[in-house]
Design a protein with these regions (language model features):
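Charged phosphate-binding loop/patch that engages nucleotide di/tri-phosphates or the phosphate backbone
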Residues: 112-126
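Active-site beta-loop-alpha junctions of metal-dependent nucleic acid enzymes
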Residues: 12-35
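Helix-centered, glycine/charged polyanion-binding patches within enzymatic domains
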Residues: 18, 37-105
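Short, mixed charged/polar active-site loops
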Residues: 9
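Short acidic-glycine loop/turn motifs at beta-strand connectors
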Residues: 2-6
Length: 126
């Protein structure tokens, strides 16, 4: 999921449980509409790979993700920017408040995604 803030999801996709996050995240970045130039992209540590960071730069974003501690050439991250990532985590927490999402009652992907869309609309209206 790519979210603008604690209430606004821009895009999301459903992937198998064994699939890696980074390839799906790169695909979501490619699907984003045109956003203001040089806006910050707060990413989870799973997306700190070179390919994902380079794609973010190519699309005009400033990737904000801490480097892996064992990286040979780490980069600097402004901790104040990365702390804002908790806004996105709060969106995930509120979505998990919908029992149907966290327990995965739906057997079909289309039904799960439909309810996720409904839950996102409800959260945006709060």
């Amino acid at each position: 999921m790519v979210a603008a803030d604690a209430q606004t999801a821009l895009t999301f996709s459903l992937t198998p449980g064994q699939a890696g996050d980074a390839p799906a995240g790169r695909e979501l970045l490619r699907q984003l509409p045109d956003l203001p130039a040089r806006c910050r992209l707060l990413m989870d540590c799973a997306y700190e790979g070179n390919e994902t960071r380079q794609l973010a730069f190519d699309l005009g974003f400033i990737p904000v993700v801490p480097p892996h501690p064992l990286r040979a050439e780490p980069w600097k991250v402004k901790k104040a920017w990365y702390r804002r990532r908790n806004e996105i985590e709060r969106l995930f927490r509120r979505l998990k408040g919908f029992r149907r999402i966290f327990s995965r009652f739906d057997k079909l992907d289309v039904m799960f995604m439909a309810f996720l869309c409904f839950a996102l609309v409800v959260e945006a209206l709060r």
